[in-house]
Structures are given as structure tokens and as C-alpha cells.
Amino acid sequence: MWFFGFGSIAPFSVRRQSVKKKFLAIPAVVVSAAMAMTGCAKAPDEEPAKDTSAASSSSDTGSTAKSGVKACMVSDTAGFTDKSFNQTSLAGLERAEKELGVKIAKVESKSDKDYAVNIKSLVDTKCDLIVSVGFLLDKTTVAAAKENPNVKFAIVDDQPQGAPNNLKPLIFNTAQSSFEAGYLAAALTKTGKVGTFGGMKIPTVTIFMDGFAQGVEYYNKQKGKDVKVLGWNAKSQDGQFVPQPDPFQNVAGGKSTAQTLLNQGADIILPVAGNAGNGALQAVKASGGKSNVIWVDADGCRTQASYCDNIITSVYKGMDVAVFDAVKAVKDGKFNGDPYIGSLADKGTGLSDFHTFDSKVPADVKKELKTVEKDIASGKIKIVSAAQPLK
């Protein structure tokens, strides 16, 4: 049995349509004191959302066959057009509107000061379920859930400590799929160096970086190679991150961070930086085919189509399906606070298609990746990262 790990150990458990588990009962334990949420906001408009320069923007729409359930969503500062986890999460909400007949509303945050105000505005409009998108809304969402026990909450890409049982974490063990990405990068590099960088040093970012580094290490052990990982030391948990302020939106900072890795010899980069990752795409495209990226969160060839020739594959998270299933659980009266943990085993995370790189990935590497995926899913390969979600 192969076992990879750095730092403290956190246990873990989980391309898309099968994330229907963990929505049945066992209430979560409520711990820690409630946190106060302040501020008030204008209720979401009864019009489709339009882009504005205001602090936040919102919309409230209903379907023709209403179910009586109102499901709502608040973005982080990257917004719903981030071509990443906010946009993917919103797709799940909009699918629920179409297929389940629920009414939906969304509010877009322009700064972190909007989080509490926006969630309160959704509470005030009588949402049955409020979905917060992203780790940065952690404390605000926990506080709101404690203050509003009759409202159901879910949070994407975060597992809050001390959350009440009306708050469901929707999280993904991307260490598993990033391990595959690391193995693939090590197999394809021509320079013997691959790289990764993050937006911020937070668990939902470093989980990718840990998995990626361990996948490279596994490839080296299997093949007797010495491919180097630049930008992240999984043992010391030190590495390259996009400069402040607003690192997930700092495209120029993402480009300069990627360029540093390219200058050091990396020819494949895994940017874990939201919209700032577009800077990495710009940097590799400028290399004239000498370097490429592995994208994260969503299929980059769909969300960043103009860069598809530079995207080998993507480490996806089934956020849209997880959001849809959370809404369905509310509609069906089966919602609870147990975390949903997407994994390779249930296709809640994985690698997307190779698209333009399909003919460039050797058949033996594709076969090896299938074996690696199977061995991770079965537990034969153990990946250990302090950032992995708790069961």
C-alpha cells in the first residue's frame, strides 16, 4: 500500500451525475457560541440580475412550475462570472430552478464587507435554503445559520467548525484528483520540472497543491525519476502565492507568479488561484507552446475556451451537482447538516477530458492514470493532507 503524507493527518471519505449521497439524516453537533451578524441590505430585486458597479448585485427569478421552495445563493468577491467555482455553483442553482420548479435568488458580493449584508437580505426575502459560495464566507455563514435556525444553509468549498445542523458543507477531496494531475504532469514534462501556486494559503487551495506534489512523488517512485515540484513544499507547507490585495482577482499577480515558475524551468503549472489563474494562462500562451497548465475547479476548455490549446486537463469539482442535490433535498424534505464530500469514488471530483491534448497523452499514461484513480478510490494509495475534509 502506498502512503503519502506531510504534516498533520486528517481523515477523508468522496464525472458528475452521481453525487446523491450524504443528504439523509444524522444531525450534526452544535458547538461554540454564536457570532453576531450586522448590517442590513436591500432585498434582492424581482428582476433578472444585471451587471452593476454597486457593492453587490442581486436577482430573484421564479419558474413557471413553482414547488413552493425558494433557494438562494450569495457569491464571494469573485462573482458569478468568475468562470470558476461561483459560476459552476450557480449553474446548479439554475438547474434546480428548471428541473425542480423552485424559485431562486442570487446576490453577488463585491467586497468581504458585503457577506453579512447579503446573507441577511436573503434571510429577509424568506429563502428556504441559502447557499454561500466559498471558504471566505465561513464565519458569516455559521453566524447566520445560528441566528436563523429555521432557515437551511449550505456552503460550497468549506467545512466550518462548530456549524449548526441547519448548515450543510459541500466539500470536495481534490487532493485525490490533484494527485492524478501531479502524476500526469510528471509523465508529460519535458524539463523535469512542474509547478503550482495558490491564491491564498487556505485549506481549499493547499489541498490541490498537496495532492499535486504527492502525485509527482508517486510517479517518481514508480518510474525511478526525479521530477521536481516548484512553488510548493508539501512537507513544510511553504510555497508561491499570488500577491495581495485580492489575490484571487489579481490576474497580473497570477501572471507574474506563473512567470517566476516558468523562469525556473517548469513547463506545466497547476494554478489554484481563481480568476488570477488567468494570468497563468496568459503566461503559458506567450511561451509559444513550450509550457501549459492543468486548470482547476471546472473544465477549463469550457470556461476558458480561448486557452484550450494550453490546458492539458482540469481538476474539476462537481459543485453544480452538489448544489442541485442540496436544493432537491430541501424540496424532498430530506435535508440535513451532514457534509457532502465529493471524491473520485462518486465522481464528485476528477480529471476532465484532455480535449486538444488527447493525442498528446500517451496510451500507457492514460492506462496508468486509470489504475491510479482506482487505487486512490479503493484506498490502496493513501493521500494525506491536513487540508482534506473531515468525514
Listing of model-derived features with the role each one plays in the protein:
Residues A36-G39:
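C-terminal motif of bacterial Sec signal peptides marking the signal peptidase cleavage site
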Residues M1-V19:
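Short, Lys/Arg-enriched N-terminal segments with co-localized hydrophobic residues
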Residues Q17-V30:
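Bacterial N-terminal signal peptides that target proteins for export
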Residues A41-K391:
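A residue-level marker of the well-folded mature domains of exported/periplasmic proteins
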